[in-house]
Amino acid sequence: MGARSSEAPRVERRLRGIVERVTRRSLAALLGEYNRARRVRGVALVVGSTIDPATIGNDHIRAHALEGQLFRTALQRAARASRLPCTTLVERTLYETAAERFKRPATALKSAVAELGQPVEGPWRADEKAAALAAWLMLRSVH
């Protein structure tokens, strides 16, 4: 960014504040739109990893992990500000987590999620399936 070392913490706080403010506004606008037709019951985030970026030795990879952590944290805070429960799920263990919570085999859940996408026009790839399963888990936890 070109900021001097002494300015870096101040710049980081300012930029983090901007990200959090924009995220809160965006989530509030989305909730306003959705709540006209239905009630949003929670937020489920599917992430690649929850590893502490400080443990990553490679600067480039650590920067990406910090960016992911920033946006994940901003969305979690925005959900709390909107009084919505928020859960974060790791993608690579998503089906195992769901199998444990639903007390059903992961293979049965994969089939059920695949079936959910049959009437959907457009893509129903891994991202859409993960989002559907995460939403299912969130709905289960709020009931």
Predicted regions: what is each one?
Residues 1-143:
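Phosphate- and other anionic-substrate recognition elements at nucleic-acid/protein interfaces
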